[in-house]
Amino acid sequence: EIGVRLVGSEMCIRDSTCTSQDMAGNTRTYTFSYLINTEDKYYLENITEKLDDGKEYSFITIDYSNFRALRIQQKVDTFEHNSTATTPSGNEIANISEIPSLFITDMYPLSMHAVAIYGKILGEPANYLITQLIPDSNGESEETTTYTYTLDNRGIVTSCHAVVRHIRNGYEQDYTRTVNYTIE
């Protein structure tokens, strides 16, 4: 399958490498790899970004060992971050809307490919809607992100309300946003 990378005129083939140039003329190379399930559905397993000099700058790896608790490893430059994206067992919301999880399009370097993610050019979305993103090591600031969905009478997602809760030294602060969807 061939998918068009929507920045510039380059083309990507699944399980391949894409190269693009930013406005400053820097070349960035992205390599994608996929987990293919028994139904021949592709799930993005890894994206790696390399700079002009061939040095790895960033990556995201998604472990699908448990589809209700996806393990995400992210590295950007020298910063590494691991988290778990969960949906409660027995209370799953089937992703019949086939939308990607918001955290996927928020994490660099995948944030550079949001249109391709929504277009399913970079693989299928999770089978269940993710309801919580929990960092492994919160350090000084405890943080969780909770996702709440509004569905229409067909079970199609019409909105996702995300709340990022930071707790530091007993002080709580929430950052909220709502993304509305129109799916015909």
Cite the ranges covered by each PLM segment.
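Single conserved hydrophobic/aromatic residue that forms the stacking wall/gate
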Residues: 1-8, 12-15
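A short, structured loop/turn motif at beta-sheet edges
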Residues: 10, 34-39, 65-66, 149-158
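Beta-turn initiation residues at beta-strand->coil junctions
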Residues: 17-24, 28-31, 45-53, 71-78, ...
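Short helix-loop boundary/capping segments
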Residues: 47-122
